[in-house]
Amino acid sequence: MKLHELKPAKGSRKVRNRVGRGTSSGNGKTSGRGQKGQKARSGGGVRLGFEGGQTPLFRRIPKRGFTNINTKEYALVNLDQLNAFEDGTEVTPVVLKEAGIVRAEKSGVKILGNGELTKKLTVKAAKFSKSAEAAITAKGGSIEVI
């Protein structure tokens, strides 16, 4: 076998269908757009959510609620993720970010109680769940709200 004899596997490369190139091609004249009408024109077609003039669903349904501008979103960390650190480590939001456990700090870090903690750690975070607090102190570690 030589380089010039190489060919792609049968059926692995499909020829692009060129429309509007003669009637015998099967996609000539109207190019697969049917006869006249909005969808046959260039740039034709209806906008997203358009229902033919009927009041669309998003306008029939009443508005509800609002977005609270004062809401705080915390980066969540579970107890089993803290096992990545050595015994006696001081775990802070900066350390968590460097370790790749937290991507963005947001309004701070909240420690949740999912999983089991096996290390004795000093954890500094904005918030702790009650179960996380209990688990950290039970292992001889300490918590500090920052």
Swiss-Prot record:
Compositionally biased region (Gly residues): 23-35, 42-51
Alphabetically ordered keywords of this record: Ribonucleoprotein, Ribosomal protein, RNA-binding, rRNA-binding
InterPro entries named among the record's database cross-references: Ribosomal_uL15, Ribosomal_uL15/eL18, Ribosomal_uL15/eL18_sf, Ribosomal_uL15_bac-type, Ribosomal_uL15_CS
Single GO cellular component term: cytosolic large ribosomal subunit
Highest taxon of source: Bacteria
SUPFAM superfamilies reported in the protein's UniProt record: Ribosomal proteins L15p and L18e (SSF52080)
Basic residues bias (residue ranges): 10-19
Region (Disordered): 1-51
Any one GO molecular-function label of the UniProt entry: rRNA binding
An example Gene Ontology biological process: translation
Function, as annotated: Binds to the 23S rRNA.
Family to which this protein belongs: Belongs to the universal ribosomal protein uL15 family.
Subunit structure: Part of the 50S ribosomal subunit.
Alphabetized PANTHER family for the sequence: 50S RIBOSOMAL PROTEIN L15 (PTHR12934), LARGE RIBOSOMAL SUBUNIT PROTEIN UL15M (PTHR12934:SF11)
Protein name per its UniProtKB record: Large ribosomal subunit protein uL15
Source species of the chain: Streptococcus equi subsp. zooepidemicus (strain MGCS10565)
Lineage: Bacteria, Bacillati, Bacillota, Bacilli, Lactobacillales
Encoding gene per record: rplO
